[in-house]
Amino acid sequence: MNKPLSLAGLGALFASCFIAANAHAQAGATLPTFQNASVHDPSVLKAGDTFYVFGSHLASAKSKDLMKWTQMTDGVSATNPLFLNGSKNVYTELAETFAWANTTTLWAPDVRQLADGKYYMYYDACQGDAPRSALGIAVANSPEGPYVNKGVILKSGMWGQASYDGTVYDALKHPNTVDPNVFFDNAGKLWMVYGSYSGGIFIMQMNPATGFPYPNQGYGKRLIGGNHSRIEGAYIMYSPATSYYYLFTSFGGLDANGGYNMRVARSTNPDGPYYDAQGNAMANVKSDPSKPLFDDASIAPYGVKMMGNFLFERKLGEAGTGIGTGYVSAGHNSAWYDPATGKHFLIFHTRFPERGEQHEVRVHQMFMNADGWPVVAPYRYANETAATVRPEFIFGDYLYVNHGKDITASIRKSQLITLNANGSITGAVSGTWRKVGTNQVEINLPGASTYKGVLLTQWDETSKSYVTTFTASSREGIAIFGSRLIPRTDMQVATAIYNELSLGATTAVTGNLTLPTTAARNAVISWTSSNPAVVSNTGVVTTPASGSVNVTLTARITKGTATLTKTFTVTVRKLGGLVAYYAFDGNLADSNGAFGAGSVSGGKIDVAGGSLTYGAGMRGNAAVFDGATGVRLPNGLISSNTYTVAMWLKPAQLTAFTTTFFGARTTDSWVSFLPMGHGGVGGASMLWSGSAWYDAGLGMNIPVNQWSHVAFTVNNGAVNVYVNGVKRFSGTNFPNVFTTTTGTFALGVNYWDTPYKGAIDELRIYNAALNDAEVAGIAH
């Protein structure tokens, strides 16, 4: 039996883990810094020493190093500088395009510099719910504009009329004229590849002197897709390293639930034919017209899948913070080859696990494997260079991801494997590995031919350290990633778990507790309750009929031969009571005494700063918010699916999406009360939940510069919202958000939107759903 370690010993062991972390990989000399930008469908341009990306909705950004991006523009508007030229703007310049496409926005463009030194933007607009689109050219002397329209070159969606090939437009076989990529081939010829869903991806030859298509090509030549198959975002890159042209596309739907994933095929000619690693002709890849629209199953087996939804999951006790590093619906990429360094880059947008539809640009380096197929570095580019990887930095535990071949919204979470010194692989999968040359690797696993790829040293943003990674793909077109974990002994792992293990807010528990049973490196946590009738060994809570009961929970952490124990005191309270009361009488204290005081934040929930003041309230003082300040409340204020939130509000102004009370389990699961809602409820005040969207519009706005009492009750999905004691909304199936005792809560701010300006007073939180009379009582 192992002797429990003292707290002093735990701290020393944890410190030694941290020190060792600096020597577990062939680390770079400096720590990388990143600055993020949001450009959907980023198309890359190198002009001088600056990289530009241009994307949908006229968004753009620039960077000197592919790591730190500066947002230049975002959103189609009359003031967007890319088209602003005196009295002219994007709406006047592209009036024909907007009129044809029945829209006021733009889709993914591409910008290329031609022989005259000018920059040619290939812009496009689409109706959205139909492939009625226009694609044209605008020209500027600088990548940053202003661009001057030269005219539309292609249209689609001319229902019942002759299309460019002389036949009546048919969306099953003719393209949607969007998503252009213009490129020079190895012989100096200019081409444009384009298309999205509908009839597929097409390519046509362009005149390098004018940038316009050569005549009599119709829509050009189809390369892949058709019958409304979900294939889009085509981009072609030539690699001198292999003498192949690589056709990148994105399969699936672009939103967080669409299963977007990047794939590649190759050809010795710019206009094909293109083949995948199994030798399948991509021209034959299309949906089955006899099946329902957007038939993903028919196209999923084809192409070399480079990346799908994944998460290098950080488990309890592993280095770093948060859930780990991963992507959701990464795609619509561009690519760039650097002739000076021989590096290949993949530039794409991505969403993220537990962050909904938020998206940012990411750049990853690509490497050509032994079979001439590009494999993508698992982590974002941090100025790494392929180099010899020494054996002592290869052996060890890895987080392993197999991207599969399917099109799915599911996130593939990492598994734990070990690359052993004898060439075996053990853990979640079994197989063999061997290093080839300086940094090539071959990995043999069940279910596929040999995975061929590279080993490299990369910056891991989760552990904030350099780690060894591998990336490889098989002849079946399946990609795998690996990320080496910091070497630790069993006791070091157990110690790290001990230090991080927490149950969150445990002073006013009324709902079931989430008791973790697994942790880093497959460690096991078992639980024992001092009073199973109140809190079971699995965290099931039975509330007392009156008062409160204290329960001791003991966690036993086991990793190999190492064992540690940690205890927690949990206070379980009766249902129906007030659990928190913030009166704001000159401070942010909980007058009920169950929770700690709030703290002042800046203009976002996770940003420091802010300046909170106090003024006259409904009772005593109130908290006064200046439009740049929030209040961070204690975690775990609500931890069940039965609760009431009540407060007095006096907004100084109404701005869309601005929150007053905000609570979240994650950035993708939250509840928010808005004095002014979105357009879906006509801008009315609303209780809002996402990203399992729920709109509880009140049909009115609480007034500016007047006090209004707002309350909402939730009872296992039944929801009611009240203003001044009067029920304004009643519904069912409200999302169950607060399933843990670690939820995040705030007033006046969230992660994204304009902060609240006005006053808040008398915030009360109950662990029960008050009835109509009870709500009316606290409102008067």
State the predicted function of each range.
Residues 2, 573-627, 776-780:
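Extracytoplasmic low-complexity segments
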Residues 26-492:
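Carbohydrate-active catalytic/glycan-binding domains of CAZyme proteins
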Residues 239-241, 706-720:
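Localized edge beta-strand/strand-to-loop motifs within extracellular or lumenal beta-rich domains
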Residues 358-360, 722, 751-760, 772:
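Extracellular carbohydrate recognition
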Residues 488-575:
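Beta-rich interaction/scaffold domains
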Residues 576-579, 588-592, 626-685, 704, ...:
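Extracellular glycan-recognition modules
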Residues 686-709:
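Short, aromatic/His-centered strand-loop micro-motif at the edge of beta-sheets
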Residues 731-759:
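Flexible glycan-contacting loops in extracellular carbohydrate-active proteins
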